[in-house]
């Protein structure tokens, strides 16, 4: 009898320690699928709600694989007007590639989607900000990774509530640095040629 009580207690304790084991993990389960359900708080929660309301469905947030910015949310004064803007990386059931939503606050302080743009692949490899143009605006530099292993780079400019892709091309490595001494940052793209040589492009 004592042994039976002990086994029952041990089983209950084990179940208490493993609350996530009520369903089996399958190979096709994505981490992002598991992170979709929780409702976020603060600005992130407000951005998530604003995006879902605009889409009419629940967006799946996309996390960059590497780099300094590892969140699907980016809060920054992108257009240089002194007010904070936001960019959100996501996909939906209807989109095969990653999309980016750009949001601003309205007069009441609520986040509103201004525009969305479709990215170049289904995975975000890295994200960073760069000041590649004159003025106070900053550009969003996004590296994408396609399923077949190809890498693509896009640079987005967001001004006056509109987003434009000012660069979209394949790459192997890139660097953002003011190497010309002009005050703004420069974009250097590196790729390997068919003959094994290295091609370097400087975009200023």
Language-model regions, residue ranges each:
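Hydrophobic helical h-region of N-terminal Sec-dependent signal peptides
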Residues: 11-15
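N-terminal export leaders
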Residues: 3-7
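Beta-propeller-forming repeat regions
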Residues: 21-204
């Amino acid at each position: 009898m004592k042994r039976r009580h002990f086994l029952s207690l041990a089983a209950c304790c084990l179940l208490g320690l493993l609350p996530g084991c009520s369903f089996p993990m399958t190979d096709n389960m994505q981490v992002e699928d598991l992170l979709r359900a929780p409702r976020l708080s603060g600005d992130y929660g407000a951005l998530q709600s604003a995006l879902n309301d605009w889409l009419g469905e629940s967006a799946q947030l996309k996390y960059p694989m590497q780099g300094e910015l590892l969140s699907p949310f980016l809060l920054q004064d992108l257009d240089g007007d002194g007010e904070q803007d936001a960019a959100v990386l996501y996909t939906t059931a209807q989109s095969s590639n990653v999309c980016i939503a750009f949001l601003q606050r309205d007069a009441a302080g609520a986040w509103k989607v201004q525009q969305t743009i479709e990215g170049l692949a289904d995975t975000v490899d890295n994200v960073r900000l760069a000041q590649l143009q004159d003025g106070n605006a900053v550009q969003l530099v996004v590296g994408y990774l396609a399923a077949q292993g190809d890498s693509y780079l896009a640079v987005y400019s967001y001004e006056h509530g509109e987003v434009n892709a000012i660069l979209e091309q394949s790459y192997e490595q890139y660097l953002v640095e003011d190497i010309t001494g002009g005050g703004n940052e420069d974009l250097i793209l590196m790729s390997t040629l068919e003959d094994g040589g290295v091609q370097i492009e400087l975009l200023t």
